Amino acid sequence: MDKSKNLFDLLQDDEEVEKKPTTKSTQAAAAPVAAKKPVAPKTENKVENRSPKLGGQSKPKRVNNGEQQVATSEERQNTKRDSKSYPKHQPRTDATGNIRNRQFDRKSGTGRPHNENKKGGAGQGNWGKEGSVDAETNVATVTPTEGEKESTEPVVAAPVEDKTLTLGEYLKQQGSVTLEAPKLRVAGEGETKNAQWDEFEPIQREVVKQRDTKSVKEEKKTKKNVIQVELKSAPSTQRPKGNTKKVVKGVDVTDVNIFPSLSKA
């Protein structure tokens, strides 16, 4: 075995494709290519979003999820202010797919959707149950047989009596009626000596007098024990503070011996 042989050549299963060498002569012999025409620049139809009330100032375009909304000719006629079309508002839903903040709204208790036909049933505003109208029409369209035609004869209605009264007749009729008071049953009426209760004897019970507790309480309230106590203050043993000199009595001004000029001459 030759050691110089490359072992990785065994991994190449695909057949090798021989590359054809390209020469400059073949490239020159090729047909000339037509000259390219200049491409005109694309002009975008830009819709200017200018408001006539604000002096024609440019504003950013309204974009909904990266898509520009362009108004059609029909939408321009229906709009009042400008030619912009606005997407319809879709309410937000929760994880279950229901509209949010609607769990406390009023709902139909019947479980029927609003689009369901409600003509079945009775009551004011309904048209009866299914099949009732057809049954009435079938009865009306039934044709009687020959035997039934002979038996069905026109029935003459009996004349209705006129029971109306005038005022004078009504007063006479009321005057002839006498009103009697119902008889009242007298006590002991219909009772006999041999009644069902004659065999029994009346029960006699002694009346027990109970002591009145109120009088006892009133007696206790009237008799009260009164104790006379004489309160006296104890004599004071304290001496007066300060100067202990005797106070000299004043002179009698009306004394004639002391003031002789006051005597009568």
UniProtKB/Swiss-Prot annotation:
Query: Is this entry keyworded S-adenosyl-L-methionine?
Result: no
Q: Which GO terms describe its cellular component?
A: cytoplasm; nucleus; phagocytic vesicle
Which intervals carry biased composition (Low complexity)? 28-42
Does this UniProt record's set of keywords contain Magnesium?
Answer: no
Task: Please report the name of this protein according to its UniProt entry.
Answer: Uncharacterized protein DDB_G0288133
List where this protein forms a coiled coil: none
Show the ranges annotated as biased composition (Basic and acidic residues). Answer: 73-85, 102-119
Q: Give the start-end ranges of region Disordered.
A: 1-160
Record-linked Pfam families: HABP4_PAI-RBP1
Q: State the family named in the UniProt similarity comment for this chain.
A: Belongs to the SERBP1-HABP4 family.
Membrane-crossing ranges are none
State what this protein does: Ribosome-binding protein that acts as a regulator of mRNA translation by promoting ribosome inactivation.
| Superkingdom assignment | Eukaryota
The family database entries (InterPro entries) matched by this protein are listed as: HABP4/SERBP1-like (IPR039764), HABP4_PAIRBP1-bd (IPR006861)
Which controlled-vocabulary keywords does the entry list?
Answer: Translation regulation
What are the BP-aspect GO terms? regulation of translation
One MF term from GO for this chain? RNA binding
